[in-house]
Amino acid sequence: MDQTFQLVSDYSPQGDQPKAIEQIVTGIQNGKKHQTLLGATGTGKTFTMSNVIQAVNKPTLVMAHNKTLAGQLYSEFKQLFPNNAVEYFVSYYDYYQPEAYVPSSDTFIEKDASINDEIDKLRHSATSSLFERRDVIIIASVSCIYGLGSPEEYRDLVLSIRTGMEMDRNSLLRKLVDIQYDRNDINFVRGTFRVRGDVVEIFPASRDEQCMRVEFFGDEIERITEVDALTGEIKGERHHVSIFPASHFVTREEKMKKAIANIEVELEERLSVLRKEEKLLEAQRLEQRTRYDLEMMAEMGFCSGIENYSRHLTLREAGATPYTLLDFFPKDFLLIVDESHVTLPQVRGMYNGDRARKEILVNHGFRLPSALDNRPLKFEEFEEKVGQAVYVSATPGPYELEHTPEMVEQIIRPTGLLDPVVEVRPIEGQIDDLIGQIHDQIAKDERVLVTTLTKKMAEDLTDYLKEIGIKVRYLHSEVKTLERLEIIRQLRLGTFDVLIGINLLREGIDIPEVSLVAILDADKEGFLRAERSLIQTIGRAARNANGRVIMYADKMTHSMEVAINETKRRRQIQQAYNEQHGITPQTIQKRIPEVVQATYAAEETGDYKASSTSSKKLGKKERQATIERVEAEMKQAAKELNFERAAELRDVLLELKAEG
């Protein structure tokens, strides 16, 4: 297999890109540890980094600071590298409430989580790709610095089978159970296997469509085929297949026995400390919880919350650095930190928050002290694990400035687009002025982003604009990742014209259709109106030839002045380049992709709304006709075994009858 990166694109590097690519590639080849690409918004930083990846040909980890941006980057890299392994590694929780204890009210909050099966599959796909090939790009969120199992153990437990191999059926079944696969002859899903006579079908943890069918003749593997799990259609013959463990926290039996013995020793030591301190309730609680976990581990090889025992399972010393996704990469991997001014501070802050919560659990007998070693990396540990890094940002932070005094600048856009014109208008009458601007944009079939300071203001403004007939949506922190990507897609498609947000419209949100960004209360100094935030927000209008920004402010703050001056400086450089090369600015033409399957497939997208009009507006005869129609639809749906739709229609029917 060809293990080189192959960039597939209709474009070649333009403007500042060739120079930036050459500088970064030379830096990597010369062994530079840190480099920063200071790239203005819309200058094609992703395309530049793709060219760098192709040139240096190293396995690459691309870190983003949230799932939305990671999803967007995953889509882009997938298109640019269709022949290579582009993987996605983010937290697999749609919802996550870590276990916690509140001493003041004596409240223990059990861990509660909703795991996104699709993202779990992609995480397994990412780690297995790293062991199978070198042409791998993994797009990850900051969750990649959280503890995973030992990569050596994971690699050693890979089940390698080939045709002609001597192995009886029961040995294969035992080995599958050892690597956390469940036997399920009825519900055949990822991470399970089923048995039919001399045929074993295995559904790898990293797949969701194809399974492996292994056929035995006596004690020999006669045939291996790749099969569509749903239809049973044979997709191809395989002479060799590697089955990777179904859990990243997988341990061999002898190691598990050793780990259990070590946990028992730690438990006894901790119980004696708690009893000496007369913390009898805590001691009893700890003993009960830990003994239950030990029993599960001895019988099943697994328990709920097994990650809290990861130090023992990997036989590490107390306080030792945990294994993370970074350990699954070869030593010479390349790290690219996107929007580094936000991502690096996130990495820095992860350890302390996690530690504070776990210390309370340990002190009150909910966990053993070794649970403190199931943690994210400290920033110094993260630095040690990274060989070479490229930080990418339009507004580099203090860390980048300190480590890369000479930055690689990328200011010219391949499309000739200029940084937007920034205008300052008074706060008085800002909403009326904004409405006038919105109507102008809608007339030109262009979109508007509005950024406010508070959630309440965003909600009130959204309601007010809706009342006067403007198609508007509000993007807030409670909107799920998957929904957020869909909202941005709907804005691009023109389903609505105005998107309002607080801090969600800054880094990396790529919407070429937006030609106006309105910043309300721009003169209120603070995190949301700091110079970096303002430059990033201004950048949202830099992908459209008519891009402009209106700041509503009564005074010119230092942050506003810096942001406006930097925008002017870049605009002058861009204008001079365009005049010299006879370039006319053109809005970026960017395909509107389907929402990335990596983050969306686990969501149910079927629309089960009844086709009735609002019952409030119906007369008596119309209501009766609607009731009959909905009832007929409901019965038809039930006949077709479409029970979700039938249930939805039943609820509508009850409403209609209640109002009658």
Curated annotation (Swiss-Prot):
Positions occupied by motif Beta-hairpin: 92-115
GO biological process: nucleotide-excision repair; SOS response
Stretches assigned to the Helicase C-terminal domain: 430-592
SUPFAM superfamilies in UniProt: C-terminal UvrC-binding domain of UvrB (SSF46600), P-loop containing nucleoside triphosphate hydrolases (SSF52540)
Residues that coordinate or bind ATP: G39, A40, T41, G42, T43, G44, K45, T46
Cystine residue pairs: none
Pfam families per UniProt: Helicase_C, ResIII, UVR, UvrB, UvrB_inter
InterPro entries hit by this protein: Helicase/UvrB_N (IPR006935), Helicase_ATP-bd (IPR014001), Helicase_C-like (IPR001650), P-loop_NTPase (IPR027417), UVR_dom (IPR001943), UVR_dom_sf (IPR036876), UvrB (IPR004807), UvrB_inter (IPR041471)
Cellular component GO terms held in the UniProt record: cytoplasm; excinuclease repair complex
Residue ranges annotated for the UVR domain, each copy included: 624-659
Subcellular location(s) per record: Cytoplasm
CDD domains, A to Z: DEXHc_UvrB, SF2_C_UvrB
Domain Helicase ATP-binding: 26-413
GO molecular function: ATP binding; ATP hydrolysis activity; DNA binding; excinuclease ABC activity
Keywords: ATP-binding, Cytoplasm, DNA damage, DNA excision, DNA repair, Excision nuclease, Nucleotide-binding, SOS response
Record function comment: The UvrABC repair system catalyzes the recognition and processing of DNA lesions. A damage recognition complex composed of 2 UvrA and 2 UvrB subunits scans DNA for abnormalities. Upon binding of the UvrA(2)B(2) complex to a putative damaged site, the DNA wraps around one UvrB monomer. DNA wrap is dependent on ATP binding by UvrB and probably causes local melting of the DNA helix, facilitating insertion of UvrB beta-hairpin between the DNA strands. Then UvrB probes one DNA strand for the presence of a lesion.
Family to which the UniProt record says this protein belongs: Belongs to the UvrB family.
Domain notes: The beta-hairpin motif is involved in DNA binding.
Summary of subunit composition and partner proteins: Forms a heterotetramer with UvrA during the search for lesions. Interacts with UvrC in an incision complex.
Official protein name in the record: UvrABC system protein B
Primary gene name: uvrB
